Amino acid sequence: MLVSVIVITYNSAQYVMQTLESVKRQTYKEIELIVSDDCSSDDTISICNSWVNKNKTIFKDAKVVQTPSNGGICHNYNYALQQTKGEWIKYIAGDDILEDNCIERFVANIKPNIFLYTCITKHLQNETGKIALYSTRIPDDTAWKQARSMLKYLYCINGPTIFIERNHLVETGGFEEKYPMIEDWPIAIRYTTSGMRIGIVDEPLVQWRIYGNSISHSNHSFAISLREAWYDYTMRFCWQYFLPLHLYHHWLNHWLLKHSKDGAFIKLFGYVLRCVDFVNVKRKIIPFNNEPYRLVKQSEL
């Protein structure tokens, strides 16, 4: 079975060689490698082209492509998806690392009617080189319980852990480009609320590089837009799926984040609200009716 490994890059010259070498070391050999660059302004493209030319015989196919314009993570994901031939897709950012047995273990754990998998993450601290394990924290349970858990505890699958079936991803519209910098949260909620549970591979298979000044943890404009998109998607879901306490929880968290310097009280209120079990009054999965980004209106329930 052919697996397409997609290395997503944007100004990744400093670390992309480490990523590519980790793909090269995979114990699973039926791999198509695609490096998809989102219009980098550094030497990423030349570095990747040089590496691929030297190592392309290792793979079933290998190439470097570039998006027509800089459109963000999800746009790059979808552009690369169009270039693939594999039955399954493994995405990895150009500064993250695959464990040597990553693809082999994902393939070995494929089960019928599960189209999206995640795994344990190794957090690689960029400044110190230290590694810490980070579990999925998503229950290996029904799709609805997984969706409810993600909303209740405000966590999701990590982007570097995504292993996804190609045809199903294409048929459901790919990644949601309305939120260009969030690839993991919308697709995880979309799949689980459509009745499709996420498969859990309880093994550390990827290293996710964490920066001390990571923009996702700062007041950088990128981080602000990221949080706004996360909030927008979550609030729409909570409102239209009758999750009033979730709705209040996310609104309060968002308000605190915007109106306090560091969102200092966000965890306190979050922990208090988590004492309450949030319940969907309909107690059922509401399908998307094959329209991947359309949330069902209250009048349709």
Q: At which residue positions do the language-model features occur?
A:
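C-terminal subregions of glycosyltransferases and related glycan-biosynthesis enzymes
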Residues: W185-P186, T193, I198, P204-L301
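Glycine-rich, basic loop-to-helix element that forms the pyrophosphate-binding segment
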Residues: Q66-T84
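Conserved nucleotide-sugar donor-binding catalytic segment
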Residues: D141-S225
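Conserved donor NDP-sugar-binding/catalytic core segment of glycosyltransferases
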Residues: N101-L133
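Short aromatic/hydrophobic "clamp" motif used to bind/position activated sugar donors
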Residues: I89
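A conserved acidic beta->alpha catalytic loop
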Residues: D37-I47, S69, A93
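Short, well-formed alpha-helical segments that are part of the catalytic scaffolds
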Residues: S12-R25
